[in-house]
Amino acid sequence: MKLLFVSPRYYPYTGGVEYVVKSIAERLVKRGHEVNVLCGKSCINKPEENVINEVSVIRWPVYAPGDAYHIPRMRNSLKRLLLESVKNYDTVHLHSVHSVLTIYSLGTLKDQSIHKVLTPHYHGTGHTFFRRIFWRIWKKYVRNVLTNVNVIHSVSEYEAQLLAMDFGINPVVIEHGVDDWILEVAWNPSDYVMYSGRIEKYKNIHRLANIVKHLNNMGIYLELKVFGEGCFKRKLKRRLDKIGIKYELKPPQTYKEYINYLSRANLFGLLSEKEAFGQTVNEANAIGVPVIVVEPWGLNFKERTRTLITKLSKSDEEVAKEIAAFLEEAKKQPKPEVLSWNQVVDLYFKILYSP
């Protein structure tokens, strides 16, 4: 099979969507399929092509203010490329309705007979005031192009509910997987709480720090390790200094180093207001690291052991008390069951890529 993926960005950028696309694309190549990726890159003036682990990648010039939107430049040339190249593919799999590059590509291909799959990675709205205003307008355009897709794939039950509510569609739900070797990694807890991902205000890392402070006051002495980049990083550092806990604030790690840190975390916390799924939670679950998440999106993990689901409306002190009890209980529970990426690829072929 010949497949084209459209993604906001691609490796070596290490965002959540890009990680998912890379995980699927490279496994398809290993199974003998031909895979190309069309993605955006904001610091170039003309398209670039390269091959990464046998996946052919075309990086298209985009505007990405605030590391968002991914608005394609040279749109006439992009349109010609898409219309010409789809003649050579069996399936095009587009990722993220929050990316203009993705929706522009889908609109360009709306009348083409190629099998089209869309994974929206949808979380309902934008993360800032301006982005929320923009999303109200953008949503109307997204609604129009969704009618031209053969299969809409949701990564979680919560995302599926949002898509049904906002667009009146019922997507196929297939959750993300993890690398097979991660399933063999043992949990060896140390004395820290961990967060890894984008450092944005809506991720509520500052609240996680407050919770660690309350745990320390309760006699549970843990530090906080934060890995990532984002526009809230400087403000977060000031808040961490003010809170007065022991912490480390580091840039994103290599994947193996990230997993090494994760396997030694006493607790992984993701208190984000909005997530389509939460891949870091998936990886923590696969290792057996106790995790705290929040409603509503955290309900994706309601059937999993060693997972505490709480509400952002609770005070940080209340959440700390929940965690104190949870950490004792989690040690007695079995490790959660998590799919591998190879199992997920099997489901993609069976459900998403079959005409």
Question: What are these language model-derived features?
Answer:
Residues 41, 158, 177:
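Carbohydrate-associated surface elements
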Residues 135-152:
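Membrane-proximal helix-turn-helix segments that form the acceptor-binding/catalytic region
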Residues 273:
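Aromatic "clamp/platform" in nucleotide-sugar-dependent glycosyltransferases that forms part
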Residues 235-253, 309:
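Nucleotide-activated donor-binding/catalytic signature segment of Leloir-type glycosyltransferases, i.e.
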Residues 183, 314, 318, 328-355:
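A charged, aromatic-enriched C-terminal amphipathic alpha-helix characteristic of glycosyltransferases
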Residues 45, 91-113, 117-125:
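An aromatic- and histidine-rich active-site surface loop
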Residues 4, 153, 184-213, 225:
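Conserved donor-binding/catalytic core segment of Leloir-type glycosyltransferases
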